[in-house]
Amino acid sequence: MLLVRNSTLGRLSSLRGFFRNINESNIFYRMVHHKVTIIGSGPAAHTAAIYLARAEIKPTLYEGFMANGIAAGGQLTTTTEIENFPGFPDGLTGSELMDRMKAQSIKFGTDVITETVSKVDLSSRPFKFWTEFNEDQEPETTDAIILSTGASAKRLHLPGEETYWQQGISACAVCDGAVPIFRNKPLAVIGGGDSACEEAQFLTKYGSKVYMLVRKDHLRASQIMQRRAEQNEKIEILYNHVTLEAKGDGKYLNALKVKNVKTNEEYDLPVNGLFYAIGHTPATNIVAGQVDLDEAGYVKTVPGSTLTNVPGVFAAGDVQDARYRQAITSAGSGCMAALDAEKYITELE
């Protein structure tokens, strides 16, 4: 007889071809109930886990298996060097930071499960949820959920982009702009909204010149942001331009193949950095239609808290933050979510 939690049953069943003695008759699964379930794997998720575990509310954290196409640890795992997270004067990689956070949450008693929560039912209490390996099985249940599923930067997936991702191409100027490979070098920003203007302005602190590649013949940004970009001597706005390819020496980016859609002229633009500023996609599919979302798909929370419109469901990190999107702010909101969830659980008892 094999006794497993029901979240593991689907995975074992999928391995039946490798283990001939595994069949439905000798697998007995048990329903699992949690006090607090954290969905996510970034700074918000692990900070929430640390606080809850230290409060003796043993949380379960589903970190996912390549959830939303990103390894456990979230977007930070795609960042080569982090120099602005307090406490690390020598810097460290995003993966190193997340490994330390995960080790700390496990140390205090968090149950970390490497499966992706693919479905939730918030219509009754306790809440129900399923993972991608057990959607046809009985669900697990939980008294509270902390959503910290993050948001992924929109990318163009240009030819050459994978080669030079984090070797000249980034989706966060604030995170990566100060990296040595960008200092005193020509840089480019793709986008025409407020975020693109803000990132271009920020990058002028480090780059010798910043090109804004704008697909249309005008900026979408607010008037004040447009004016600041247009009046900055280090920013050159290339209207009616699209990017066709990322080029380099095999190690680092050194040019973009661009096209003027008005004249059809194609040419190589020498730059050592490309920053996407075309928006983010919050990972809210599993709660769409159950939790209130804003127009961009981010989870709405009560100002000054992590409470959603569903009592017992909390949101932390980039999934509810369209503005800051930093590791430190995500960690802070994870702490808030833990405290909010702890209060909720205490009141239930």
Curated annotation (Swiss-Prot):
It is found in: Mitochondrion. SUPFAM superfamilies: FAD/NAD(P)-binding domain. FAD binds at S41, G42, P43, A44, I70, A71, Q75, N84, V117, C175, D318, R325, Q326, A327. Residues 1-30 form a transit peptide. GO terms for biological process: removal of superoxide radicals. One of its GO terms (cellular component) is mitochondrion. GO terms for molecular function: thioredoxin-disulfide reductase (NADPH) activity. The keyword tRNA-binding does not apply. It is an enzyme of class 1 (oxidoreductase). Its main location: mitochondrion. It comes from the Eukaryota. Its EC number is 1.8.1.9. Its cofactor is FAD. InterPro entries: FAD/NAD-bd_sf, FAD/NAD-binding_dom, Ferredoxin-NADP_redctase_2, Pyr_nucl-diS_OxRdtase_2_AS, Thioredox_Rdtase. Disulfide bonds join C172-C175. It holds the Pfam family Pyr_redox_2. Binds 1 FAD per subunit. It catalyses: [thioredoxin]-dithiol + NADP(+) = [thioredoxin]-disulfide + NADPH + H(+). Keywords: Disulfide bond, FAD, Flavoprotein, Mitochondrion, NADP, Oxidoreductase, Redox-active center, Transit peptide. Belongs to the class-II pyridine nucleotide-disulfide oxidoreductase family. Homodimer. The active site is a redox-active disulfide bond. This is Thioredoxin reductase, mitochondrial. It comes from Kluyveromyces lactis (strain ATCC 8585 / CBS 2359 / DSM 70799 / NBRC 1267 / NRRL Y-1140 / WM37) (Yeast). The lineage of its organism: Eukaryota, Fungi, Dikarya, Ascomycota, Saccharomycotina.
